[in-house]
Swiss-Prot record:
D-glyceraldehyde 3-phosphate binds at residue 50. It is an enzyme of class 4 (lyase). Binds 2 Zn(2+) ions per subunit. One is catalytic and the other provides a structural contribution. InterPro entries: Aldolase_TIM (IPR013785), Class_II_FBP_aldolase (IPR050246), FBA_II (IPR000771), Fruct_bisP_Calv (IPR006412). It comes from Nostoc sp. (strain PCC 7120 / SAG 25.82 / UTEX 2576). Its EC number is 4.1.2.13. The gene is fda. One of its GO terms (biological process) is glycolytic process. Zn(2+) 1 binds at residues 84, 198, 232. Belongs to the class II fructose-bisphosphate aldolase family. This is Fructose-bisphosphate aldolase.
Length: 359
């Protein structure tokens, strides 16, 4: 099966009531781990790369790694997604490099640091939608800024994240604005701000509704029942992996991620894409530290890279099962980008709100 657009997977997930983890990648071992887990669980795959990941791996290397995954696992539908595009040009370059889905994050200006106005966000996102949909490529937008409801601070990821602190009005997606944004931009998926942030240090305590607003997802889904919602910064930060890292020389302080059961609540309320990166980074780091500590004379990189694949594969397989993704890859049929482009042109995939549907 060739690379497929994100919309194909999210539509299937919505029809069948499950979510799909979207795993960030920048090297061979990560891609191998994800695809091994997907094959093990019969799960569709969303691979995503940030601007930093594309620079690190190199465009040609990354593109061919993804094509190798498609060739090796022809039975698995795979999406290649641009994560947090800071400007239309970033999204267009991703499309030129065979990405089948892009995120135009207009919640921040092009410097990826300054919170943007609603009007700016709508304009740049709509610009990308017009170009991408003409090619059958899916588009994710974002409304609200990712950051902590405890501190008001964000966590930059590959240079993407606001500086300073924001208030709750900026850190929580407004349901009314969400309706206006989706109708004005026609995005395929909407990333919402509910108190999650990038990195391992998301919460200082086990999150409750006060600092993790799953109820905001429920309200947005009520207003936009046919819009695919996205949770960013949704690693669960497993305690056992942190303990293993620290056992072998790490110094990660106590921290809390997004509990799986809270993500499952979100999936029941329209969340179809769940972004995960930190959990896999922790798995790789734990494996490498353990392997090096147990055999300090070893200098063959394969000695510690092989365990990193195994540890990350375990995390990915667990998320596929926990989110209900498992068992669905074989049920999804190939649909070309050209077919999706025709559907967009005919208005068959237009986004509408619950209120508009009643008119």
């Amino acid at each position: 099966m060739a690379l497929v657009p994100l919309r194909l997977l999210l539509d299937h997930a919505a029809e069948n009531g499950y979510g799909i983890p979207a795993f960030n990648v920048n090297n061979l071992e990560q891609i191998q781990a994800i695809l091994k887990a997907a094959a093990e669980t019969d799960s569709p795959v969303i691979l995503q790369a940030s601007r930093g990941a594309r620079n690190y791996a190199g465009e040609n290397f990354l593109r061919h790694l993804i094509l190798a995954a498609v060739e090796t696992y022809p039975e698995i539908p795979i999406v290649m997604h641009q994560d947090h595009g800071n400007a239309p040009s970033t999204c267009y370059s991703a499309i030129k490099n065979n990405f089948t889905s892009v995120m135009m994050d207009g919640s921040l200006e092009a410097d990826a640091k300054t919170p943007a106005s609603f009007e700016y966000n709508v304009n740049v996102t709509r610009e990308v939608v017009n170009v991408a949909h003409a090619l059958g490529v899916s588009v994710e937008g974002e409304l609200g800024c990712l950051g902590s409801l405890e501190t008001g601070a964000g966590e930059a990821e590959d240079g993407h994240g606001f500086e300073g602190t924001l208030d709750h009005s900026q850190l929580l997606t407004d349901p009314d604005e969400a309706v206006n944004f989706v109708e004005a931009t026609q995005v395929d998926a909407l990333a919402v701000a509910i108190g999650t942030s990038h990195g391992a240090y998301k919460f200082t305590r086990k999150p409750t509704g006060e600092i993790l607003a799953i109820s905001r997802i429920e309200e947005i889904h009520r207003r936009l029942p046919n819009t695919h919602l996205v949770m960013h910064g949704s690693s669960s930060v497993p305690e056992d992996l942190i303990a293993l890292i620290n056992e072998y020389g790490g110094a990660i302080p106590e921290t809390y991620g997004v509990p799986v059961e809270e993500i499952q609540k979100g999936i029941k309320s329209g969340v179809r894409k769940v972004n995960i990166d930190t959990d896999n980074r922790l798995a790789i780091t734990a494996a490498v530290r353990e392997a090096l500590a147990k055999n300090p004379k070893e200098f063959d990189p394969r000695h510690f890279l092989k365990p990193s694949i195994t540890y990350m594969q375990k995390v990915c397989a667990e998320r596929y099962v926990q989110f209900g993704t498992a068992g669905n890859a074989s049920k999804i049929k190939q649909v070309s980008l050209e077919t999706f482009a025709a559907k967009y042109a005919k208005g068959e995939l237009n986004a509408i709100s619950k209120a508009a549907a009643k008119v």
